[in-house]
Amino acid sequence: QFGNYYQPQPTYSPPARQQVPILQYSNEVNPDGSYAYSYQTGNGIAAQEQGYLKNPGQRDLEAENVQGTFSYTAPDGTPISLRYVADENGFRAEGAHLPTPPPIPEAIARSLEVIARTPQQPFQPQPQYNPFRRF
C-alpha cells in the first residue's frame, strides 16, 4: 500500500553506561525543619549540605539558611570544588573554577569613594512645558 514511500527512520540508542556505586549516603531531617545530607559516589562526586530555618514563626524575619559543598572531576581532568551559602542575603558560591571580575581601575575606585562621601541632594523634578497638556 505504501509502495516505495515508506522508509523506516533510524533510531537513537544511547550508549550503555556503567552503573556508578554510591559509596556513602546520609540524609537526616529533623522535626524542627533542620536537615543535613551527604553522599559520595564511586566516580568521585561528593556533596554535603545542611540547613535550618532562621527566626521560625516570625513572618517577616524567617529565612532558610543553607550551606554546603560539592566536588567532582571535570571531563578534562580538572578537579572542581564548590562551597556555597544561601540565606537572607542570597546565594553566594566560592570555587577556584568560578570566574572573577577584573579589578576596578584606580580612577573609577577614587570616583566611587568621592560619590560615597558626597551627601546626596533630594531629587526635585523641574516643571517642563507640555504643549499637549489640557487644562
UniProtKB/Swiss-Prot annotation:
The modification Pyrrolidone carboxylic acid is found at residue 1. InterPro entries: CHIT_BIND_RR_consensus, Cuticle_Struct_Prot, Insect_cuticle. PROSITE patterns: CHIT_BIND_RR_1, CHIT_BIND_RR_2. Signal peptide: none annotated. This is Endocuticle structural glycoprotein SgAbd-2. It comes from Schistocerca gregaria. Residues 32-102 form the Chitin-binding type R&R domain. One of its GO terms (molecular function) is structural constituent of chitin-based larval cuticle.
